[in-house]
Amino acid sequence: MEPITVNYKVLDARAKVPAYATPGSAAADLCAVLDEPMTLEPMQRALVPTGLAIELPGPQCVALVYARSGLSIKHGLCMANGVG
């Protein structure tokens, strides 16, 4: 499989470019850009800004956002359109 290039645009100067936390990481960490801490009540939903926009190289590519391991079981928090 050939490597692909994903172009990105910084929309907020506070944004962090996704990065792999360890050499064995399966995916890069994506961070929120918030003006103040966010608290969600049970069943409340919210869009969480990252301060980034991405451009995939073509229709054969997809970008997926996964919750961190244990986030749902430990905190009852999951993504509305999450995988799994």
Language model feature labels by segment:
Residues M1-G84:
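DUTPase catalytic domain/fold
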